[in-house]
Amino acid sequence: MNEINDNLNKKINEFLQKLDNVYLSIDIDSLDGEKYVGTGYPEKDGFDLDQLKRFIKNIMKSGKVIRSDLVEINPSLDKNNLTVNAGSEILKVILGNRNV
């Protein structure tokens, strides 16, 4: 799995080098829908939260992100606030306040 993550981060970095600015849009249903069900379209075999956070950190380190959003969280469909809490963790990474 680490090799896959490293290869994806490498491709992300190559792509980022071609851009001046980035609008980062994170759809919560990119997470594994078997665990994170608080979305209208849960997807099986999505990212795990730590994996997605590593990708976001990598993108944020580029300094090219000028706007970002996080979409598709539906608390009424969530179980034990797992999806809502995942969204909070993602926003902390985007904002750079990991201890908030």
What does each model-found stretch correspond to?
Residues 1-100:
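Catalytic cores of soluble, metal-dependent hydrolases
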